[in-house]
């Protein structure tokens, strides 16, 4: 594929969604063809699945059901939106991808990273991100940001206890240990301006490495 696939990962409240859109805008201004998208979601079918997964009333959802729904949404999003964009040579910036499932369901939910990776391999095949930008923030700080953001409608994961979010952070640390080559870490506790500068630098380096 001729494009570049960059994913944005991190715990709740890390600010990656805001930075992703700003980075996409900068790339577009610089003359690049960009697709900014998200998981779960990005297309109609996957957005419907997102509504099921994140509905605050669905507290009885089994962890395996949750993992399978994420994988299903990921598959449809991949074949309908991500792969075509990469084949067209676009830069794809995606808010969450497989690493979220590994950290949230594999580690925090206790299903096992290897098991969840296997499920997702069936969904995505061999396609992995070229670069993954991890937004590092203390879980308590992330939750505080969510609580202070009146414009954000809290979803089922936002409402989890602090311990769950701490497990997610540990899960990401384990995932980064397994795939160290493609991860770039950003201190998300900094100002938006500093975080964006760091992210833009990472993306520029990736463009040079891939001769884009």
Curated annotation (Swiss-Prot):
Which reaction equations make up its catalytic activity? dTMP + ATP = dTDP + ADP
What organism is this sequence from? Answer: Bacillus licheniformis (strain ATCC 14580 / DSM 13 / JCM 2505 / CCUG 7422 / NBRC 12200 / NCIMB 9375 / NCTC 10341 / NRRL NRS-1264 / Gibson 46)
Family, per the entry? Belongs to the thymidylate kinase family.
Alphabetical list of InterPro entries matching this protein: P-loop_NTPase, Thymidylate_kin-like_dom, Thymidylate_kin_CS, Thymidylate_kinase
- This chain belongs to the protein called Thymidylate kinase
**Function, as annotated:** Phosphorylation of dTMP to form dTDP in both de novo and salvage pathways of dTTP synthesis.
Task: Write out the residues that bind ATP.
Answer: 10-17
Q: Which gene encodes it?
A: tmk
Q: Which UniProt keywords apply?
A: ATP-binding, Kinase, Nucleotide biosynthesis, Nucleotide-binding, Transferase
Q: What is its EC number?
A: 2.7.4.9
GO CC terms in record: cytosol
- State the source organism's domain of life: Bacteria
Q: Which GO terms describe its molecular function?
A: ATP binding; dTMP kinase activity
Q: Which Gene3D superfamilies would you find in this protein's record? A: P-loop containing nucleotide triphosphate hydrolases
**Gene Ontology biological process:** dTDP biosynthetic process; dTTP biosynthetic process; dUDP biosynthetic process
